[in-house]
UniProtKB/Swiss-Prot annotation:
Outcome reported for the amino acid change (mutating residue 348 to A): No effect on general translation
Name of the featured protein: ATP-dependent RNA helicase DDX3X
Reaction equations catalysed: ATP + H2O = ADP + phosphate + H(+)
Modified residues (N-acetylserine): 2
Length: 662
């Protein structure tokens, strides 16, 4: 045993001697500069210039690649080559390698194709490869796979001619002139190429006015409904400016803040949305318009794994889409800093306040490090802007321009609206008749009021042999995304939904919206029927009405008259008997749909004319300049106290089937 121990000891001595920790005369080309320096075995007997240990960068580096990662202190692989180019590197080979960037947010079922090398370690490829030195306005090489993924959906069947009749108002000092074509304003090579890939032929009304306003760096409050193209209206000019200006101080602050995944991210643009579905939708649009650029969009929202979202942020974030609650969480965790946020967008602003997000919004905008108004550029978009919310906008916007765009669908008559008296007990059988008449392959969206009602109706339709699915707030994020995927793809052409899907979801080719249960306020009705007839396409909206819905009689009547829709005689009689009390139909001073707009600029006096851009359709027999200026606020049911529920049972079933227009 002792003999073996002696041999082992000798063997170890020989091995340590081979390491030669104290002498490097025979290594590194005999350089005296390296005397006393430990040389790893795999780098011995090489020239000094091949590799060295840099005390300043705290890591092994190669001289030729030192510039690429000097700020990161990264180490090279065994060939002296930066790990940026290694299969196991912490960053991708570039933004458009063969793995692409398919799933930055980790949502959906494609999470295995992340696009950041085989082993993701929080690498930040677009922010570290000299991205502060490169020209951000120049497009990166194309990726056929990513291009197919982002743009294969296409925009088919768009009826832009219908948009010509939509009225538009712009009020404010020195309003920039609107454009007629995307080429009328300089947005750069990247944006114009992506516009061509999305097959946008010409801007929608809200884009015609909003794009030049934002390009002029003016604050904007736009009253425009979802489906009008408002998402692109703010993404296009914001991204164009980022490409033109570059990352600026945000990149330097990110590098100085920490190393690798511990870095706080400083987005250049922030978009706030009320729901996770709308946030994901905006993020997907941002991915399209940031294709072939160095801008990396990210999305964070509640109801999903925060760890995955943090890992996604750690790879870099220039444009952030977020729900208010989750963003506050990220800020308190030290993952997001708003010090260099140049562009702030509040999408569906009325909905966010309605959902109680005002404290979080004020926390984000006013009580943190976000630049003040006048320094940052702020945009608010929504389908309606009551006077109370316009007054609130004074705290966020500086010398803003108010843009009111007529409601897409109702004003342009793209959506045929039908209101049918159906007793509560007859709704299911009537729904089956509608589904049979619509056709099996047509996408049909059925709205109900409660989560329990959604599950019950889905179960009923399933047992009746219909391919259907449902979505509501109690479903997990994965279940909701899967339901939307099944619906969009046509595998389940019937989607039963609560109000969670009514706001902002961009589901193309929905042919029929059915209000199985009418909402309690007219704004929710406008959003629901806006799921069909989107972006100029034609659609049909059918609503089941009975004594439970008397509270919206007046507003529903006003909306149908304005949109030049057929008004059932029983609805006129009901509105006359229970609310108007002798005043002529449609002349209520409190009409919230005055002139075809969801709201008007409260800064304009009630007698002043503020219409700079309008069509003949904007004129109306109804008067009143308040738009949605009543003091009722949100929640609906404002007129519920004026009505009782008796006297209407079954007296209006004589409509037959000709309501469908056949």
């Amino acid at each position: 045993m002792s003999h073996v121990a002696v041999e082992n000891a000798l063997g170890l001595d020989q091995q340590f001697a081979g390491l030669d920790l104290n002498s490097s005369d025979n290594q590194s080309g005999g350089s005296t500069a390296s005397k006393g320096r430990y040389i790893p075995p795999h780098l011995r007997n090489r020239e000094a210039t091949k590799g060295f240990y840099d005390k300043d960068s705290s890591g092994w580096s190669s001289s030729k690649d030192k510039d690429a990662y000097s700020s990161f202190g990264s180490r090279s692989d065994s060939r002296g080559k930066s790990s940026f180019f290694s299969d196991r590197g912490s960053g991708s080979r570039g933004r458009f390698d063969d793995r692409g960037r398919s799933d930055y947010d980790g949502i959906g079922s494609r999470g295995d194709r992340s696009g950041f090398g085989k082993f993701e370690r929080g690498g930040n490829s677009r922010w570290c490869d000299k991205s502060d030195e490169d020209d951000w306005s120049k497009p990166l090489p194309p990726s056929e796979r990513l291009e197919q993924e982002l743009f294969s959906g296409g925009n088919t069947g768009i009826n832009f001619e219908k948009y010509d009749d939509i009225p538009v108002e712009a009020t404010g000092n020195n309003c920039p002139p609107h454009i007629e074509s995307f080429s009328d304003v300089e947005m750069g090579e990247i944006i114009m190429g992506n516009i061509e890939l999305t097959r946008y032929t010409r801007p929608t009304p809200v884009q015609k006015h909003a794009i030049p306003i934002i390009k002029e760096k003016r604050d904007l409050m736009a009253c425009a409904q979802t489906g009008s193209g408002k998402t692109a209206a703010f993404l296009l000019p914001i991204l164009s400016q980022i490409y033109s200006d570059g990352p600026g101080e945000a990149l330097r602050a990110m590098k100085e803040n920490g190393r690798y995944g511990r870095r706080k991210q400083y987005p250049i643009s922030l978009v706030l949305a009320p729901t996770r579905e709308l946030a994901v939708q905006i993020y997907e649009e941002a991915r399209k318009f940031s294709y072939r650029s160095r801008v990396r969009p990210c999305v964070v929202y509640g109801g999903a794994d925060i760890g995955q979202q943090i890992r996604d942020l750690e790879r870099g974030c220039h444009l952030l889409v977020a729900t208010p609650g989750r963003l506050v969480d990220m800020m308190e965790r030290g993952k997001i800093g708003l010090d260099f946020c140049k562009y702030l967008v509040l999408d569906e602003a009325d909905r966010m306040l309605d959902m109680g997000f005002e404290p979080q919004i004020r926390r984000i905008v006013e009580q943190d490090t976000m630049p003040p108004k006048g320094v940052r550029h702020t945009m608010m978009f929504s389908a309606t802007f009551p006077k109370e919310i316009q007054m609130l906008a004074r705290d966020f916007l500086d010398e803003y321009i108010f843009l009111a765009v007529g409601r897409v669908g109702s004003t342009s008559e793209n959506i045929t609206q039908k209101v049918v008296w159906v007793e509560e007990s007859d709704k299911r059988s009537f729904l089956l008749d509608l589904l049979n008449a619509t056709g099996k392959d047509s996408l049909t969206l059925v709205f109900v009021e409660t989560k329990k009602g959604a599950d019950s109706l889905e179960d009923f339709l399933y047992h009746e042999g219909y391919a259907c699915t449902s979505i509501h707030g109690d479903r997990s994020q994965r279940d909701r995304e899967e339901a939307l995927h099944q619906f969009r793809s046509g595998k389940s052409p019937i989607l039963v939904a609560t109000a969670v899907a009514a706001r902002g979801l961009d589901i193309s080719n929905v042919k029929h919206v059915i209000n199985f249960d009418l909402p309690s306020d007219i704004e929710e009705y406008v959003h629901r029927i806006g799921r069909t007839g989107r972006v100029g396409n034609l659609g049909l909206a059918t609503s089941f009405f009975n004594e439970r819905n008397i509270n919206i009689t007046k507003d529903l009547l006003d909306l149908l008259v304005e949109a030049k829709q057929e008004v059932p005689s029983w609805l006129e009689n009901m509105a006359y008997e229970h609310h108007y009390k002798g005043s002529s139909r449609g002349r209520s001073k409190s009409s919230r749909f005055s002139g075809g707009f969801g709201a008007r600029d409260y800064r304009q006096s009630s007698g002043a004319s503020s219409s700079s851009f309008s069509s003949s359709r904007a004129s109306s027999s109804r008067s009143g300049g308040g738009g949605h200026g009543s003091s009722r606020g949100f929640g609906g049911g404002g007129y519920g106290g004026f009505y009782n529920s008796d006297g209407y049972g079954g007296n209006y079933n004589s409509q037959g089937v000709d309501w469908w227009g056949n």
